[in-house]
């Protein structure tokens, strides 16, 4: 009877594996790094349109850049002399997988640690320079980061140099426990000695600058300038809201909010930072 006859097979909508493989061979692949999505305006941007400064052409958002990219944008070509590359962590807590994580970060960034330190010329002005890189374990501050920055200040005192630091950090490095927290006091003491010597210290806040770095040397500069829209704070927004039981302003912990309340002296476009650094260092008795 027709009523109980076998139904025809359903039409296949999804191609089987053989069809998939034949189709995929004929479709050109788009390279992974050809486009970037802006975290602010959500637009897809052709990488070449970002330019060397990595700024969104639609909303002017400043993408996070590596220490090497920052260096190329800032210093006179060929003038940078890297220092303190021989310092290594002793891994005092023998934290599980810490050494593997360090090795992975070194391979990914080309850096030995989360901060690049040395001396350089910026438009002819000689200075001691530190650049933190958030791509290296979120530029967390451990014993090596603290020691390198402390030695940079000590060298600057001996050679009568101004210090310029580009800050970026997720805070203290948990894998080193109390030793990482101690770096806050150690670096702050070095900043004070540099200040007592009558030398200029400029901090440039970049996205993100949080935790122990914010609570110490990031906010201790003689002048504090920042890149637009950078996130700067100590504790996270949700932690603060839970503690105070209040809703915070939408722009809370953005540098524009901090400038409005007197915590930041100026907000400077990334493309203008080189000129601003040279001007401020020269104005405060820089060394050429």
UniProtKB/Swiss-Prot annotation:
Q: InterPro entries of this UniProt entry? A: AcCoA_carboxyl_beta (IPR034733), Acetyl_CoA_COase_Trfase_b_su (IPR000438), ClpP/crotonase-like_dom_sf (IPR029045), COA_CT_N (IPR011762)
Residues where Zn(2+) binds: 38, 41, 56, 59
Cofactor info, note text: Binds 1 zinc ion per subunit.
According to the UniProt entry, its GO molecular function terms are:
acetyl-CoA carboxylase activity; ATP binding; carboxyl- or carbamoyltransferase activity; zinc ion binding
One annotated GO biological process: fatty acid biosynthetic process
Q: Which GO terms describe its cellular component?
A: acetyl-CoA carboxylase complex
Source superkingdom: Bacteria
Q: What class of enzyme is it?
A: transferase
Pathway where it operates: Lipid metabolism; malonyl-CoA biosynthesis; malonyl-CoA from acetyl-CoA: step 1/1
What catalytic activity is recorded? N(6)-carboxybiotinyl-L-lysyl-[protein] + acetyl-CoA = N(6)-biotinyl-L-lysyl-[protein] + malonyl-CoA
* Stretches annotated zinc finger (C4-type): 38-59
**PROSITE patterns membership:** COA_CT_NTER
- Keyword terms: ATP-binding, Cytoplasm, Fatty acid biosynthesis, Fatty acid metabolism, Lipid biosynthesis, Lipid metabolism, Metal-binding, Nucleotide-binding, Transferase, Zinc, Zinc-finger
Q: Which NCBIfam families match?
A: accD
Write out the similarity annotation: Belongs to the AccD/PCCB family.
Q: Which HAMAP family match?
A: AcetylCoA_CT_beta
Q: How does it assemble?
A: Acetyl-CoA carboxylase is a heterohexamer composed of biotin carboxyl carrier protein (AccB), biotin carboxylase (AccC) and two subunits each of ACCase subunit alpha (AccA) and ACCase subunit beta (AccD).
Q: What does this protein do?
A: Component of the acetyl coenzyme A carboxylase (ACC) complex. Biotin carboxylase (BC) catalyzes the carboxylation of biotin on its carrier protein (BCCP) and then the CO(2) group is transferred by the transcarboxylase to acetyl-CoA to form malonyl-CoA.
What's this protein's name?
Acetyl-coenzyme A carboxylase carboxyl transferase subunit beta
Q: State the organism named in the record.
A: Streptococcus equi subsp. zooepidemicus (strain H70)
């Amino acid at each position: 009877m027709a009523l109980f006859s076998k139904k025809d097979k359903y039409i296949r909508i999804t191609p089987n594996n053989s069809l998939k493989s034949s189709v995929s061979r004929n479709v050109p692949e788009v390279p992974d790094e050809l486009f970037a999505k802006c975290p602010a305006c959500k637009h897809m941007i052709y990488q070449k349109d970002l330019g060397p400064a990595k700024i969104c052409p639609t909303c002017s958002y400043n993408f996070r850049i590596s220490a090497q990219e920052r260096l190329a944008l800032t210093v006179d070509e060929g003038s940078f002399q890297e220092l303190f590359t021989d310092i290594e962590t002793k891994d005092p807590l023998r934290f599980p997988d810490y050494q593997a994580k360090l090795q992975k970060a070194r391979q990914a960034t080309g850096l030995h640690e989360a901060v690049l330190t040395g001396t350089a010329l910026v438009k002819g002005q000689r200075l001691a320079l530190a650049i933190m890189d958030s791509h290296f374990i979120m530029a967390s501050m451990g014993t090596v980061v603290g020691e390198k920055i402390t030695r940079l200040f000590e060298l600057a005192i001996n050679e009568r140099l101004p210090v310029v630091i580009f800050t970026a950090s997720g805070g203290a490095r948990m894998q080193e426990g109390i030793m990482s927290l101690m770096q806050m006091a150690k670096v702050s003491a070095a900043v004070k000695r540099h200040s007592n010597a009558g030398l200029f210290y400029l901090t440039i806040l970049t996205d993100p600058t949080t935790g122990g770095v914010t609570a110490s040397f990031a906010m201790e500069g003689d002048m504090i300038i920042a890149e637009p829209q950078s996130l700067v704070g100590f504790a996270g927004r949700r932690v603060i809201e839970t503690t105070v039981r209040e809703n915070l302003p939408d722009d809370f912990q953005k540098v524009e909010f901090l400038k409005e309340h007197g915590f930041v002296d100026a907000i400077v476009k990334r493309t203008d930072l080189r000129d601003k650094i040279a001007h401020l260092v020269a104005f405060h008795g820089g060394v050429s």
